[in-house]
Amino acid sequence: MAEANKAVFRILIAGTMEAVFRELTKTGEPQGAVFNAVLTLDSPGLVRGRRMQMRTGSGRHAIVVGEVMELEAPTRFAHTHRFTQHDDPSCTVVYDLKKVDGGVEVTLTVENIPAGTKTETEMRRGGDFILKNLKAIVETGRPPLGTRLMYAMFGALEFVLPGRTKSENWPL
């Protein structure tokens, strides 16, 4: 469902709140649900106000920069989000988890999407992808085969990322 500057994605995952929340907030290792990026912080501990990046597995490129806005384990995680390869303004990503019959309802809301930008295109396309991968990881222990193959290509082709995404250009 989409609004002018907002997109909402929802999925039911057969798992625990803690397992889902851990996948969304783990640091120092690839997040299979989020394009296999590594959530990297300016200092240990995921807390409000902490600067963060989503980096490639090698750590050489920062794909997203942002700041933790809210963290209420295991029900809510919100952060600002700005793609380093675009000159677009930040948006806000919010994950809300709710225990329901059959598991956990996960709602991914992207707010303040800059209209008419590359960020808008990518955020509207990425929500379902992230949630479907999150579901597969929590329920089966790994992303679907197609996603795993795509991630292997990401690693092999990291050298084609724009120079502006190099982590050294985005100090924490």
What do the predicted segments below correspond to?
Residues 25-26, 73, 139:
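Residues at helix-coil transition
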Residues 80-136, 145-149:
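Beta-strand/loop substructures that line and gate deep hydrophobic ligand-binding cavities in soluble
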Residues 14-18, 69-75, 96-105:
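A short, structured loop/turn motif at beta-sheet edges
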Residues 6-8, 61-66, 88-94:
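Short, surface-exposed coil-to-beta transition loops
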Residues 1-43, 168-172:
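Hydrophobic ligand-binding cavity/cleft-lining segments
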Residues 40-82, 167-172:
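Glycine-rich portal/gate segments that line the openings of hydrophobic small-molecule binding cavities
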Residues 20-24, 30-31, 68, 77-79, ...:
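Hydrophobic pocket/interface hotspot
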Residues 136-172:
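Short, highly charged C-terminal tails/helix-capping segments
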